[in-house]
Amino acid sequence: MKFFLATLFASAVSSIAVDRLIPGAQIIPESDTRALLRVGGHHDKYHDRRTITIRPSRNDTDDVSRDFLWGIKHANHGGRLLLKKGEKYVIGRKLDLTFLDDIEVQLDGELKFTDDVSYWQENNFYYDFQKSITFWRWGGKDIKIFGTGLLNGNGQRWYNEFAGQEILDPDNEYYRPILFLTENATRISVEGITQLNSPCWTNFFIQSKDVSFDDVYIHAFSTNKSALPKNSDGFDSLNVDGLTVTNTRVDVGDDCFSPKPNTTNIFVQNLLCNNTHGVSMGSIGQYPGVMDIIEHAYIENVTLLNGQNGARLKAWAGQDVGYGRINNITYKNIRIENTDAPVVLDQCYFDIEAAECAQYPSQVNVTNILFENISGTSSGKNGKVVADLVCSPNAVCSDIQLKNINLTSPAGSPPEIICEGVQGDIGVECQASAD
């Protein structure tokens, strides 16, 4: 009798599990190593988990966002969603993934968003900070995304239609989605994947803790020379404690790495930035009456090629802006080549006339900054100037040190370092701005 009841119960459980499946999906138990091997879900590096697969898209308009959400829910609490190598998964509907707890997503295929501009501009997650929107948002705790696959923002149409516009124009209403966004996430890691052609920022982390990226390639390019990617930053953050980026390449045409207000405990190592606006702290101090901070950052072994800026600190000035501090930042072992402004403190951000900046200077203090072992060449665009550190008269700039700086300019020698308004000895000879 007991055997009969046990068999009946097992049969019922099996039936329930099968009934829960959607067409094309599969649930593989953690113990079924052979089945995991067949689908590419067994790894030496990671422990086996209950693994979920879903059907791929048949073409670029076959939206599997409902299947994807089903897979995420069934992989939650200790499982893994596997997106298979050689397959494409098209997402055409916004997704709220802020309920996650102990989940892995193995991205070996391509996860691609539709370029239905009218849909996405009406259906998205909106954030007041710089009028940001996103296709989806990830949140919860203990979230791992890894693999060799592609997260594709399908940005070309967005680039074409945004050409000639500016994200920070108060009249701008052409909002473009961020490719990957976390909100209220704790311990989220991304490893090994490629992120391609985000319509706007590539990554934005909000109100999150312990975010890490390792061995990721971020690329944004356009097939239309008159409509290049804009604002396709590699990394942005807001109210984040613990942000780590290692062994990563970024080629996007805008900021390579640019934590924004209230980001603390930052670690960057072995980062390659090509065709970017540099590794920036900020911008901060944008919003009236609001205090922003960026604090405790260690940036080392970074290569910056063919860019607008190298190592940059940036803060807003103007009539209606905020205040704050950039504190305890180290840039060490930085190689810079063919870059307009290799080292720069910009306290007249954003796109502000010199007269207005002088009338309404930045109120962001810049303290305890170390630039050490900085080498390479500027592009010569700014003449012989290779470092420009001009502090706002309404801010405190102190304990700023330059050590072992070996930067040259094709415009001639000796290279020039500008410093103005900085308290104390900065460690190298410098001169006042000619402006």
Curated annotation (Swiss-Prot):
Disulfide bonds join 256-273, 391-397. Its EC number is 3.2.1.67. It catalyses: [(1->4)-alpha-D-galacturonosyl](n) + H2O = alpha-D-galacturonate + [(1->4)-alpha-D-galacturonosyl](n-1). Keywords: Cell wall biogenesis/degradation, Disulfide bond, Glycoprotein, Glycosidase, Hydrolase, Repeat, Secreted, Signal. Gene3D superfamilies: Single-stranded right-handed beta-helix, Pectin lyase-like (2.160.20.10). The keyword Transmembrane helix does not apply. InterPro entries: Glyco_hydro_28, Pectin_lyas_fold, Pectin_lyase_fold/virulence. The active site is at residues 254, 277. One of its GO terms (molecular function) is polygalacturonase activity. It is found in: Secreted. The lineage of its organism: Eukaryota, Fungi, Dikarya, Ascomycota, Pezizomycotina. This is Probable exopolygalacturonase B. One of its GO terms (biological process) is cell wall organization. Belongs to the glycosyl hydrolase 28 family. Glycans are attached at residues 59, 184, 224, 262, 274, 301, 328, 365, 373, 406. Specific in hydrolyzing the terminal glycosidic bond of polygalacturonic acid and oligogalacturonates. One of its GO terms (cellular component) is extracellular region. Residues 1-15 form the signal peptide. PbH1 repeats lie at residues 208-239, 240-261, 262-283, 294-315, 326-347, 366-388. It comes from Aspergillus oryzae (strain ATCC 42149 / RIB 40).
